[in-house]
């Protein structure tokens, strides 16, 4: 049912219906129509309640956990509406692995007659957006009279008459964006052909030699690119495009990964030898290792270690020399974000100043099996292949070549070394435009954890080290990095031990005479798996780990008991392991505090970028930016444009863009403008009270009712398809109650 909290816009109609001039003029959104400030219209059934104690309304100081909104922007609501309390903090695990969480499908059954509104809608559906009758591919992209016979002939279930399709089976053209197809406008041609929802802007009727009128698609050669299907090379501004043949070879187990296979065999062989030698020594030998009375114990111990190491099989090959990396204060990082971290969103963040980006987390096994959806995660926009901006006056890293660097990296996770190694070798060959390959050891989602991936690797440090060492060996010039959490349990943080192992190498590595695993960077999320997002990130612990990393990097004798100097190819390419902090970064103050006070090289921004993508702009300028409602709406429009370019402007592409735009709005609606806050800095953990904006559009953008998000999407994508569905990720946004009695 409709919520009593729905924002009402005076004389407003959805895009495509009468009265759209309130939103648009000549197809463009007119944010100026929202200059007057109007409150949310809330039905008051009882006496108003105002229980928020902040400095703004007479309270003393800043109330912990509640956003300090100025008194004049607070809304007094009745007890019957149930809105007096601040909104609950949403479970943001989905920002790390939403689609894998949705696959889990678990969840206890709801008891009682009122549905529980907390938690997540695990089994979400989005309906289908498609034409009433689809156009056959043999005519979808060609002039009306093109001689392209259909192999199915009269038995084909799709339409072949273009005029009939346009008149009867395709919805009317959209009049947003001035009625001009954003894809055609950007690229000079539209890959959606006759199925485009803006096809009227790039079609024409011409007269043929025999006097007939023929419909044709129009292209603008001056703006067209020349796409190529060469593996991994740019196609219409997108890189890392994997061919169908390669994915099919993977699916049929015909794709060869010789390096991964031989290295996996070596890992298995050496692991058995190490296990036998480490745990099979007799007690007398073990007792004699520390030393003896004549002081010759150290020499004897080294001789014994040298003899032991001679028993082990040498690795089949050593890692290739890696591309030099740099992480610093001028390179804020956009975290890997499943679902939300899609190509259009990353492209938007790069526009706003993000210097480094990551793909959504991909499952190694799915990559090895040739999954189309998983390999699609490797695609990146051409803007992500540009070098990150660095300070040219500063000596950064020896032999660092900024011109060879790029912004985009990929993140994977896996539960077995052979899977991770095969995925890494395939990615190295098929996706050349990668800055790094990052191993996710922090994903808290139950399904991922139960498979032994994600944060489960934190409790299996030896296996993780083998995986990273092997990935480093097969990844060519692409460096390997790792993202971890404090540990799996609140009471037992293990990150310090794990960091020491990853930088120095574990006991097994020293047993066989090998050095560290060769990771180029480590990112620490300042929470445990058990904690999830329930409390603030522990930057004190991150600071301790940063000091540890600095100390280990400064050690000249890596591995105090090693016999030989470690091979340079086992070492980080930059001569040091970079250390990144992650957690609750929501402003430029948080960012620079992390670098200056906690000692990290740079900060990885996750939810802060989801709520306000211009956080990167704030970091670059070193100040808060009080974005107006019209400026924020312009970012929504830009996301819609980028979405149509990425997913297409046909019915399916518009539906897909709408779905991800609504996911985007499910985070951005949490933003409270800094201009209406009593205190700064804002905290991402603060729950917002009921508030109104400085004008009606600002109020609309802050609505937590998903029906208002759909209204916003219709400003740019027109009315939703009749079969389109959107279920908010968080049940608290759904406003749906099971009727009683």
From Swiss-Prot:
User: What residue spans carry the Polar residues bias annotation?
Assistant: 1-20
Q: Which cofactor does it need?
A: FMN
Q: Name one GO cellular component term.
A: cytoplasm
Cite the PROSITE patterns for this sequence: UPF0034, ZF_C3H1
Q: Which UniProt keywords apply?
A: Cytoplasm, Flavoprotein, FMN, Metal-binding, mRNA processing, NAD, NADP, Nucleus, Oxidoreductase, Repeat, tRNA processing, Zinc, Zinc-finger
**Gene3D superfamilies assigned to the protein according to its UniProt record, in alphabetical order:** Aldolase class I (3.20.20.70)
User: What does the record give as the reaction this protein catalyses?
Assistant: 5,6-dihydrouridine(47) in tRNA + NAD(+) = uridine(47) in tRNA + NADH + H(+); 5,6-dihydrouridine(47) in tRNA + NADP(+) = uridine(47) in tRNA + NADPH + H(+); a 5,6-dihydrouridine in mRNA + NAD(+) = a uridine in mRNA + NADH + H(+); a 5,6-dihydrouridine in mRNA + NADP(+) = a uridine in mRNA + NADPH + H(+)
Question: Where is it located?
Answer: Cytoplasm; Nucleus
**Enzyme type, top EC level:** oxidoreductase
Which intervals hold the zinc fingers (C3H1-type)?
130-163, 180-205
What processes does the entry annotate via GO biological process terms? mRNA processing
Tell me the segments the record calls region Disordered.
Answer: 1-28, 43-65, 77-127, 280-323
Give the annotated active site: 443
Family membership: Belongs to the Dus family. Dus3 subfamily.
The molecule here is called tRNA-dihydrouridine(47) synthase [NAD(P)(+)]
**Organism of provenance:** Ajellomyces capsulatus (strain NAm1 / WU24) (Darling's disease fungus)
């Amino acid at each position: 049912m409709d919520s009593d909290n729905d924002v009402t816009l005076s004389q407003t109609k959805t895009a495509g219906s009468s009265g759209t001039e309130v939103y648009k003029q000549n197809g463009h959104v007119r944010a100026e129509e929202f200059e007057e400030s109007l409150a949310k219209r809330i039905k008051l059934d009882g006496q108003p309640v105002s229980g928020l104690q902040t400095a703004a309304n007479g309270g003393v100081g800043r109330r912990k956990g509640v956003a300090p909104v100025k008194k004049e922007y607070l809304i007094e609501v009745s007890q019957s509406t149930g809105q007096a309390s601040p909104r609950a903090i949403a479970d943001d695990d989905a920002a790390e692995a939403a689609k894998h969480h949705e696959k889990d499908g678990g969840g206890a059954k709801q008891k009682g007659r009122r549905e529980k509104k907390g938690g997540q809608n695990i089994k979400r559906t989005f309906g289908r957006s498609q034409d009433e009758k689809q156009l056959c591919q043999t005519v979808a992209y060609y002039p009306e009279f093109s001689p392209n016979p259909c192999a199915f002939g009269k038995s084909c279930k799709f339409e072949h008459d273009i005029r009939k399709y346009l008149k009867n089976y395709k919805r009317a053209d959209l009049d947003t964006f001035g009625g001009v197809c954003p894809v055609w406008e950007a690229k000079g041609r539209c890959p959606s052909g006759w199925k485009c929802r803006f096809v009227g802007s790039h079609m024409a009727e011409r007269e043929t030699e025999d006097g007939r009128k023929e419909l044709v698609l129009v292209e603008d050669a001056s703006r067209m690119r020349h796409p190529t299907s060469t593996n991994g090379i740019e196609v219409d501004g997108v890189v890392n495009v994997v061919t169908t043949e390669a994915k099919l070879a993977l699916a049929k187990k015909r794709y060869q990964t010789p390096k991964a296979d031989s290295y996996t065999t070596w890992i298995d062989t050496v692991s058995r030898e190490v296990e036998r030698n480490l745990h099979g020594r007799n007690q007398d030998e073990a007792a004699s290792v520390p030393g003896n009375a004549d002081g010759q114990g150290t020499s004897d111990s080294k001789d014994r270690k040298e003899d032991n190491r001679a028993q082990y099989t040498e690795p089949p090959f050593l890692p290739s020399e890696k591309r030099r990396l740099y992480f610093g204060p001028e390179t804020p990082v956009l975290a890997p974000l499943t679902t939300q971290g899609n190509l259009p969103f990353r492209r938007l963040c790069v526009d706003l100043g993000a210097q480094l980006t990551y793909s959504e987390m991909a499952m190694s096994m799915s990559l090895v099996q040739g999954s189309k959806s998983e390999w699609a995660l490797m695609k990146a926009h051409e803007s992500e292949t540009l070098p990150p901006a660095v300070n040219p006056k500063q000596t950064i890293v020896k032999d660092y070549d900024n011109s060879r660097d790029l912004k985009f990296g990929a993140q994977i996770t896996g539960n077995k070394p052979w899977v991770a190694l095969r995925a890494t070798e395939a990615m190295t060959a098929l996706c050349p435009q990668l800055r790094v390959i990052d191993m996710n050891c922090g994903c808290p989602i139950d399904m991922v954890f139960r498979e032994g991936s994600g944060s489960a690797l934190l409790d299996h440090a030896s296996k993780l080290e083998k995986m990273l060492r092997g990935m480093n060996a097969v990844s060519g010039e692409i460096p390997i990095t790792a993202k971890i959490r404090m540990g799996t349990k609140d009471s037992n943080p293990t990150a310090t031990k794990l960091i020491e192992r990853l930088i120095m190498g574990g006991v097994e590595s020293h047993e066989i005479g090998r050095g560290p695993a060769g990771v180029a960077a480590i990112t620490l999320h300042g929470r445990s798996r058990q904690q999830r997002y329930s409390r603030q990130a522990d930057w004190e612990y991150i600071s301790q780990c940063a000091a540890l990393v600095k100390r280990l990097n400064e050690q000249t004798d890596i591995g105090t008991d090693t016999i030989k100097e470690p091979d340079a190819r086992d070492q980080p390419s930059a001569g040091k392991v970079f250390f990144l902090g992650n957690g609750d970064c929501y402003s430029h103050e948080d960012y620079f505090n992390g670098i200056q006070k906690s000692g990290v090289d740079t900060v990885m921004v996750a939810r802060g970028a989801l709520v306000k993508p211009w956080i990167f702009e704030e970091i670059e300028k070193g100040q808060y930016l009080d974005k107006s409602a019209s400026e924020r709406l312009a970012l929504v429009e830009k996301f819609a444009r980028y979405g149509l370019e990425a997913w297409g402007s046909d019915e399916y592409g518009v539906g897909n863009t709408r779905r991800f735009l609504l996911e985007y709005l499910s985070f951005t609606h949490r933003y409270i403008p800094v201009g209406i806050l009593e205190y700064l800095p804002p905290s991402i953990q603060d729950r917002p009270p009921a508030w109104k904006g400085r004008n009606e559009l600002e109020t609309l953008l802050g609505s937590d009712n998903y029906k208002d998000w759909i209204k916003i999407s219709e400003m740019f994508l027109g009315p939703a398809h009749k079969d389109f569905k959107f279920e908010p990720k968080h049940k608290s946004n759904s406003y749906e109650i099971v009727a009683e009695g």
